[in-house]
Amino acid sequence: MSFLIDSSIMVTSQILFFGFGWLFFMRQLFKDYEVRQYVVQVIFSVTFAFSCTMFELIIFEILGVLNSSSRYFHWKMNLCVILLILVFMVPFYIGYFIVSNIQLLHKQRLLFSCLLWLTFMYFFWKLGDPFPILSPKHGILSIEQLISRVGVIGVTLMALLSGFGAVNCPYTYMSYFLRNVTDTDILALERRLLQTMDMIISKKKRMAVARRTMFQRGEVQNKPSGLWGMLKSVTASAPGSENLTLIQQEVDALEELSRQLFLETADLYATKERIEYSKTFKGKYFNFLGYFFSIYCVWKIFMATINIVLDRVGKTDPVTRGIEITVNYLGIQFDVKFWSQHISFILVGIIIVSSIRGLLITLTKFFYAISSSKSSNVIVLLLAQIMGMYFVSSVLLIRMSMPPEYRTIITQVLGELQFNFYHRWFDVIFLVSALSSILFLYLAHKQAPEKHMAP
């Protein structure tokens, strides 16, 4: 009876997660597109629902909600379903919609979709060869074979995003990095933009007049054909007429310049708004957060370097370790185990909420940046794939943030994976991503003022 009650709780929560994923799909991702494939919408929503359910089970584990056997059953079932979606269903439909957009392969799209999926499976399976991610006793068809490979991709993605975010967050929030933009700078750039637009209009008028003159003279109808005619039209022009090819090249160059000037003008306006915003109370608050995240970024890079050099992985969760150090330093009586469990629960909850919120914001920006009416289905499926792998990998890494007594069921469900490898791999990719982001933002920040001061 208790199993049925526990299952009804899990099914109800999954329906709610599915509904939230469905609404997010309709109101955020596809609100500007009329053509919707319901299979894509269902796959995205199901992936979101089972991804959130894994985090829900972590919280239930800490709070002791549901029977332990029920939690184990739903852990196992949830993991099997999410792996089935990520390894079999989503890759197949990505291939299917790619082939469907190619007219030559439209009649045999099912065959070519299967070929693309088999190609994916080959490279997906070969991915595990260079990494020490499995225990030797696991068979080729075990669930550990799938989750270990999904974990490598997901942890790599998480580390890349975390490394860039750790650097970009203080760069975005801190007023120290803001360029000093004045109204004079904006007016000067707008004047250059207007001058460029006037030149474009003037040259297009010249082209229109030249074409009308050529038409009146009959040069358009009697234009010679063949290679010699093309060369003559490019290199020569009739007396009193314009060389249209050269003018068109000048117009193209000016239009490209106008686009760049427009983007630079918009960037200056955005920077000026940030300067005004930084003077408000909320702006000062985020500026303080920027300094905090700067310290966190330096500490994280330092710890990642130490972990890589010393080849170490923490055995104690950060909360318990931090409380132990503080208590020993102050020499006070304190129930470390009791409070570490409660603080760990709050920390894990914050990590989960931040992960879901941050990923959804990133997915929305990414979708609007690269999607079109034809590619949108493929992009949504790719986002679903990334989302599922991201959340599975989060479970692998969040395990270390939990006290040892709560890690047991995750270890049992995920199998005898080489958890230490994933933490070391995360440190390596995080360090590379953070240092690359620092270099990129440094160069961008250094070149930006020079670009705006250019004549």
Swiss-Prot record:
The keyword Transmembrane applies. One of its GO terms (molecular function) is voltage-gated monoatomic anion channel activity. It catalyses: iodide(out) = iodide(in); chloride(in) = chloride(out); bromide(in) = bromide(out); fluoride(in) = fluoride(out). GO terms for cellular component: Golgi cisterna membrane; Golgi membrane; monoatomic ion channel complex. Glycans are attached at residues 180, 243. It comes from Cricetulus griseus. Disruption phenotype: Delayed transport of newly synthesized protein from the Golgi to the plasma membrane, impaired glycosylation of proteins along the exocytic pathway, and structural disorganization of the Golgi apparatus. Defects are associated with decreased acidification of the cisternae of the Golgi and trans-Golgi network by 0.4-0.5 pH units with no effect on lysosomal pH and no effect on endocytosis or recycling. The lineage of its organism: Eukaryota, Metazoa, Chordata, Craniata, Vertebrata. It is a multi-pass membrane protein. The chain crosses the membrane at residues 5-25, 46-66, 79-99, 114-134, 150-170, 290-310, 343-363, 378-398, 425-445. GO terms for biological process: intracellular pH reduction; protein transport; T cell differentiation. PANTHER family: G-PROTEIN COUPLED RECEPTOR 89-RELATED, GOLGI PH REGULATOR A-RELATED. This is Golgi pH regulator.
